[in-house]
């Protein structure tokens, strides 16, 4: 549908036989496009099963339950009216030979009182001339004499607006209106003794916002046929569809839930991206280098890789080396001290923690490898930013051939106030 077209509160669904839906839709659009191009009142679709015909003898005469009347202005040109009239002469339109005037004489010329239809189970169409005013596309729902008052109240309840009464036994609702054209739904009362001929291949679909409060007010049961569509009928048997607008269907909720479950977990502080964290970390390392003049400090920026970081200290004999490609397993905690024991896939590494006096020793970075930090790489730069003064993690390992193990060494650093011993755990 064109985005410029206005959505009406009423849409007429025409159910065509298999293979006829496209031709029917083109025939209707070609006709109405020259009258009201900004709206689409009719939608044609194929019905799943053919209509079952029941032969029964009716004692009372029947009148079509739904009709479409086109009121065209004469002052806009006879050629335009003749063009629209010629469309009814082309297939798939068929001429309906019947007297629908209920005993009244036709006040217009005979061709304008002829009825046309796309199918015998669809509404009938006619054209009439008007001398002034706006042109009208009027969809008329006929009801029996006894059901007229109830039918008016029913459609007022569905449309949530009051009908405009023009004369006794006739009222209408304005669905769309401009200075040139008006689209209306009218309710017309039949004469006593005339029954309604229900059009089984036609359904009136109304857009509503809530169906819960409307269902108890309907004369017949309202059955859900989809997540957002309900079906019922009026007092004369005309099909009514209720489309709940602004409604999130169960399928949409399931799709949204599945999409939400696949989203990545947002870091604790999303306002600090990895690039800004790296810059802040590099600034702190540079300050530490100016203070203690280390020989070399290198920090791996690939947080998504779970390989350990290599640190080089001022003392050449104190180094913590980790070969690239070594993956960390799940960590364990020592039951006596509570410290974390880190295991590697191919070898064992021992992490040493040294503490110095913060008043006498210069500030440096404090990095801990724990279970939560290993699983969340973004915790590493957060730890580097928050540390203002801490101890240097040192360790040593002896490199060997395959099957060799790391050997632990114990380093002890003394200062004037505090002296702590570094512990190694397997």
From Swiss-Prot:
The keyword Nucleus applies. Transmembrane segments: none annotated. It comes from the Eukaryota. Keywords: Nucleus. The keyword Nucleus applies. It is found in: Nucleus. InterPro entries: FAM124, FAM124_dom. GO terms for cellular component: nucleus. Belongs to the FAM124 family. This is Protein FAM124B. It comes from Xenopus tropicalis (Western clawed frog).
């Amino acid at each position: 549908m064109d985005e410029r077209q206005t959505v009406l509160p009423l849409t007429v669904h025409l159910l065509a036989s298999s293979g006829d839906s496209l031709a029917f839709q083109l025939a209707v659009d070609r006709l109405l496009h020259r009258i009201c191009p900004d709206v689409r009142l009719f939608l044609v679709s194929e019905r799943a099963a053919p209509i079952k015909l029941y032969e029964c003898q009716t004692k009372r005469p029947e009148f079509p339950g739904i009709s479409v009347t086109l009121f065209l202005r004469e002052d806009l040109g006879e050629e335009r009216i003749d063009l629209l009239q010629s469309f009814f002469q082309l297939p798939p339109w068929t001429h309906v030979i019947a007297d629908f005037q209920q005993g009244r004489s036709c006040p217009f010329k005979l061709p304008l009182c002829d009825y046309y239809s796309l199918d015998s189970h669809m509404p009938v169409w006619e054209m009439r001339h008007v001398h002034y005013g706006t042109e009208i596309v009027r969809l008329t729902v006929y009801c029996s004499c006894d059901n007229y008052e109830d039918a008016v109240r029913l459609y007022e309840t569905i449309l949530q607006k009051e009908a405009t009464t023009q004369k006794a036994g006739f009222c209408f609702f304005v669905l769309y209106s401009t200075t040139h054209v008006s689209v209306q739904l009218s309710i017309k009362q039949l004469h006593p003794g005339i029954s309604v001929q229900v059009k089984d291949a036609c359904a009136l679909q109304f857009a509503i916002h809530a169906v819960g409060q409307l269902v108890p007010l309907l004369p017949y049961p309202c059955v859900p046929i989809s997540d957002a569509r309900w079906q019922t009928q009026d007092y004369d048997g005309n099909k009514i569809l209720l489309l709940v607008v602004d409604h999130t269907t169960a399928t949409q909720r399931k799709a949204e839930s599945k999409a939400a479950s696949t989203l990545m977990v947002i870091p604790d502080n999303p306002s600090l991206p990895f690039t800004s964290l790296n810059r802040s970390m590099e600034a702190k390392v540079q300050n530490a280098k100016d203070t203690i003049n280390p020989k070399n400090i290198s920090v791996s920026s690939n947080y998504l890789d779970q390989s350990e970081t290599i640190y080089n200290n001022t003392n050449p004999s104190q180094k913590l080396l980790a070969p690239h490609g070594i993956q960390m397993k799940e960590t364990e905690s020592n039951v006596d001290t509570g410290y974390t024991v880190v295991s590697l896939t191919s070898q064992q590494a021992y992490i040493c923690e040294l503490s110095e006096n913060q008043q006498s020793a210069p500030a440096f970075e404090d990095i801990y490898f724990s279970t939560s930090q290993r699983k969340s790489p973004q915790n590493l730069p957060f730890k580097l930013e928050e540390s203002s003064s801490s101890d240097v993690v040192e360790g040593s390992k002896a490199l060997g051939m395959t099957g060799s193990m790391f050997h632990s060494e114990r380093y002890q650093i003394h200062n004037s106030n505090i002296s702590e011993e570094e512990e190694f755990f397997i």
